[in-house]
Every structure is written in C-alpha cells, then in structure tokens.
Amino acid sequence: MEGKPRVKVVLLDIEGTVCPISFVKDILFPYALAALPETLSTQWDSPSFLPYRSAFPPEHASTPDALLSHVRDLMAQDLKIPYLKSLQGYLWLRGYESGELKCPLFPDVYPALKKWRDNGAKICIYSSGSVAAQKLLWRYTTEGDLRSCIWNGLEGDDGRELEGGYWDTVNAGLKQHMASYEKIAKANSALGEVGEWLFLSDNIKEVRAAREAGMKSFVVVREGNAEVTAEEREGQVLVESFAEVEKWVEVTADKA
C-alpha cells in the first residue's frame, strides 16, 4: 500500500451509495405517505408532533388536509426541503421500531466500515435525509445496529459535545455546494486535514463539489443508479464496491 494517499476520514452518502435507491424511493417514501394521514388524525395537537407541524410554512400547517396536500406535492416533485425531511424521519420511526422497515445495505458496506474503523479511521455521514432519519437507518440495517461504526463526536474541555459524524442540509448545507464540504471538514478539523477526507457518493455533482473543497472523492457505481456518462467519467475515480476504495487510497489513521 506504499505510495497511496492516506485517508483518515470517510464521509458517506446514503442513497445509491450504501443502500439501493429503490429502498428510499419504493419503500421509505411510500411508507411515510401512507402513515401520514393517521398521524395527522391522531397526533395533530400532540406535543411530540408539534415541532414537526410548526416547521411547515403557516399556510401549509393550518389544517391536517393542508399539510397532507403540501407533503404530497413536495414528494411528487422529489424536493429535499428540510422540514419535509424532518417529518419523514418522524414517520419512519414507528416502521423501523416495528420491524416493518430495515435498511438493506449493499454486502460490501459493513465489512469495509468495520475494517476502516478498526484501522482508526473515522466514518461520517452526509445525506439529504435528516440527521434523525440517518441515525434510524444505521440503527436498523440488515447487518444490525451499526451506529457504533459512525463517529459520534468529541467532547470539548468544557464537556460540550462538538460537531459529530452526521450531516444533513440543515447543519451543513446543500450537497452540491463546495461550501458544505468545507464546513464539515472545518467543524471536524481535529480528525484530519481536508485533503485526508474521502467522500463517497453516486452523485457526480456532489463528488465534484467535495473535490473543489479539497477532499478526495470517488463516484460509487451501483445497480439501479443513474448511468454515469463517458463525459461524467472523465477525471473521476469510479468504484463499484467499497472493497475497491483501497486500490486508490489507504484508509487508516494514527493510533495511540
């Protein structure tokens, strides 16, 4: 492995990278839509639901019907609005806890995460899904509860928890913006320089943004993902499995 660049932090996309796009599009999204009417009927005024309802624009949160109509419209357009993503996470909770929902990881994901973690590298997540939804997904996978694989932050000298390993469009910004990756790396600068980060995603525009920020970044090619054109492939590293990552870099960190 001599001569390969070293990576201390691996930043992972979720949909189309660690699990099939179909799990999100064909299972999670329909589940949320199906669960929403009953939730609105039984929990509209409940303290637990109020924060999610209040996050919606007032004109769309005046009645259960107005909120339901707005959610259907947003999801039909596949818009990644933070208040929608937060609500979806809330709706998925019951499905995960009941066993109806379980994230089907690609078979190469868990072995790679375990190896990288055991080598001292830190693993972080960056997804358009809310941080709460990300934690649910990693808790309920086909490989069991894998939250221990994800870096969960440090404590400062005053005991205050510093920025951790889960990032979304609220605490980081939009995924196709260079500044979002700069923010993530800066917030976790204790883990390594930005050039020691590797971002893995199926989205070419996200990969380019991460590279512009100074990170290493590879395009993950999976069955069911959009085809990567010849033009898009130019200048990019493509991997079809996490097992291929270490053909290009050494994922490890100094150990005490």
From Swiss-Prot:
| UniProt binding sites for substrate | 127-128, 175
Q: Which cofactor does it need?
A: Mg(2+)
Q: Which GO terms describe its molecular function?
A: acireductone synthase activity; magnesium ion binding
Enumerate the UniProt keywords alphabetically. Amino-acid biosynthesis, Cytoplasm, Hydrolase, Magnesium, Metal-binding, Methionine biosynthesis, Nucleus
Catalyses: 5-methylsulfanyl-2,3-dioxopentyl phosphate + H2O = 1,2-dihydroxy-5-(methylsulfanyl)pent-1-en-3-one + phosphate
Pathway this chain belongs to: Amino-acid biosynthesis; L-methionine biosynthesis via salvage pathway; L-methionine from S-methyl-5-thio-alpha-D-ribose 1-phosphate: step 3/6; Amino-acid biosynthesis; L-methionine biosynthesis via salvage pathway; L-methionine from S-methyl-5-thio-alpha-D-ribose 1-phosphate: step 4/6
EC number(s) per UniProt?
3.1.3.77
Cofactor remark? Binds 1 Mg(2+) ion per subunit.
What CDD domains would the database entry show? HAD_EP
Give the record's family classification.
Belongs to the HAD-like hydrolase superfamily. MasA/MtnC family.
Which HAMAP family is this protein grouped with?
Salvage_MtnC_euk
Task: State the oligomer form and interacting partners.
Answer: Monomer.
Q: What is this protein called?
A: Enolase-phosphatase E1
What gene, per UniProt, encodes this protein? utr4
